[in-house]
UniProtKB/Swiss-Prot annotation:
Annotated keywords: Nucleus, Sporulation, Transcription, Transcription regulation
Organism the protein comes from: Beauveria bassiana (strain ARSEF 2860)
Keyword DNA repair listed: no
Source lineage: Eukaryota, Fungi, Dikarya, Ascomycota, Pezizomycotina
Boundaries of every Velvet domain copy: 70-253
Official protein name in the record: Spore development regulator vosA
Length: 273
């Protein structure tokens, strides 16, 4: 069976990021899995597959250096759902509470130089990966690691890497979303989250240790409280509910009992649906 050559993609130096600083062990596991199974689709909804000869040739054209440079300038990301509060979880997993509401980041493809076919292909490209890190409230200092006395433990816990979910938002507009519903912070304070979008080429993941950073964004400031001061969880947004209905893995909350009375059935209103 004939082999089809793929073009050699030269990534601009500005896109290359140090593996050990930007990609943590969660990212490594994601990339390894991608390389092993050669991702053909998104977890639930990716409909764009590059398994035929024509598809592979099309992908190679799209991932050429010049095209990727254009793509970089046309891929803004927006935080559709900002984190507001969290309860500090300390150094154990027994009573870990997630950042609320869960951040949702949307990738938008609006380049004037892209055809509709290219726009839809980029929107459904299955191998985007988004990495999350925690920064101080000014957004200028990486706060991922605790002070020396804590043996360099990470401040942010949970699933720090997100994969794309393509679906309709609460206005029935199609989009590509990254949902981070399993993030917790160990210590009280004011912080921001930083999201970095990276494009992976599974066919080259075993030989490349650097992949293009397309864009990044920081959230608004959110507050992490002690258990005593934590104001409680808020009800899930219409956006979160809409994505959940379509198969996105995201927790749905009814709201916290401090904000609304406990129901007659005795359940706390902040339990998952």
């Amino acid at each position: 069976m004939a082999r089809h050559k793929t073009s050699d993609i030269m990534l601009p130096a500005a896109w290359r990021i140090p593996w050990d600083r930007q990609l943590d062990q969660h990212m490594a596991r994601v990339i390894k899995a991608m390389a092993q199974i050669n991702f053909a689709s998104n977890m639930h909804h990716n409909l764009f597959m590059f398994t035929t000869r024509e598809g592979l040739l099309h992908r190679n054209r799209m991932l050429s250096s010049s095209t990727t440079q254009e793509l970089q300038s046309t891929q803004p990301i927006a935080v559709r759902q900002q984190p507001r509060a969290a309860r500090a979880c300390g150094f154990g997993d027994r009573d870990r509470r997630v950042i609320d509401p869960p951040p949702i980041v949307q990738l938008r493809i609006d380049g004037p130089g892209l055809s509709e076919e290219e726009r839809r292909a980029y929107l459904r490209y299955p191998n985007y990966v988004m990495n999350c890190s925690i920064w101080d409230e000014s957004g200028t200092r990486d706060a991922s690691y605790m002070p020396d006395e804590y043996n360099h433990q990470r401040r942010l816990m949970g699933s720090l890497v997100g994969t794309p979910f393509v679906g309709d938002d609460d206005q029935n507009q199609e989009g590509c979303f990254f949902c981070f519903s399993d993030l917790s912070c160990r210590t009280p304070g004011a912080f921001r989250l930083k999201f970095t979008l990276i494009m992976i080429d599974p066919a080259r993941a075993s030989i490349l240790r650097h992949f293009p950073t397309l864009t990044e964004i920081k959230t608004d400031i959110f507050q992490v409280y002690s258990a005593k001061e934590f104001p409680g969880m808020v009800a899930s947004s219409s956006l979160a509910k809409k994505l959940k209905e379509q198969g996105c893995i995201i927790s749905i909350k009814k709201g916290n009992e401090r904000a609304r009375p406990r129901g007659a059935d005795g359940r706390s209103d902040d339990e998952d649906d």
